[in-house]
């Protein structure tokens, strides 16, 4: 069920980012800290290969660029590689950049300021994306309170960002302005909702809302929720550039990525504004836009097939 939710989220994420791709998700059941082997990712690569290019895999939670490189030895249908002219590398920094820019959009809207000076961010998860995001938020003047189950990594990120540290479950009780979930999904749920005192939720995790009703409850309480699949689309934009270059026989194009990322911020601005004018939760507005773009993309593809 969780994987199906993730795949639906990827479909919406790709549509919101104006990428004419469907969405899918694959999951390897196991402990990424103790059970990863080259043989495991070779087996994963063979499974992906059976789909014949209808699905491409890439780095995500618990999976590194090196892991993807192992799968690449047995299938061409992986992205986010470090070698070759089309290679886009680790998508995490670009995902973090999109979430960071989204945080600035929210700061301008709620606090009328262009940086994060004086704001406290409770950031959950300092792994791939969260660590990069912590650096960016710190540089913009935010005070950070961090948590992660990886205590060694947590201490490292906290030291370089002058951040406070709390136990994993205590992050919801931090007196903060912004909650930034950057680990696993569904942390916005019936158990955590009443504990949050923030004015905004802006984070990189997928499927942050345990149910749509949680999004409605946030809206009713005046908490601005930046929809996850909108603001964390930088990574998929980055790997889409690799796929685009590979199919055209060209090279990775950072200018194309930047154009898409800027457009993503325009879409976020539209969602936030429509939420105010239409008096609807942001996740509902985002879904309407995503579904409209999916429908338009399907129509364009059908027209091309008919013309061809």
Predicted segments with their positions:
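Predominant activation on well-ordered alpha-helical scaffold segments within soluble catalytic domains
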Residues: 4-7, 38-49, 69-72, 96-104, ...
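Glycine-rich phosphate/diphosphate-binding loop of Rossmann-like nucleotide-binding domains
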Residues: 90-178
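N-terminal ligand-binding/catalytic initiation module
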Residues: 1-86
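Hydrophobic beta-strand scaffold residues
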Residues: 55, 144, 165, 224-225, ...
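Flexible, glycine/charged-enriched surface loops at secondary-structure junctions
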Residues: 14-19, 54-60, 111-120, 168, ...
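Adenosine-phosphate binding glycine-rich loop
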Residues: 107, 199-308
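Rossmann-like adenosine-cofactor binding region
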Residues: 118, 151-231
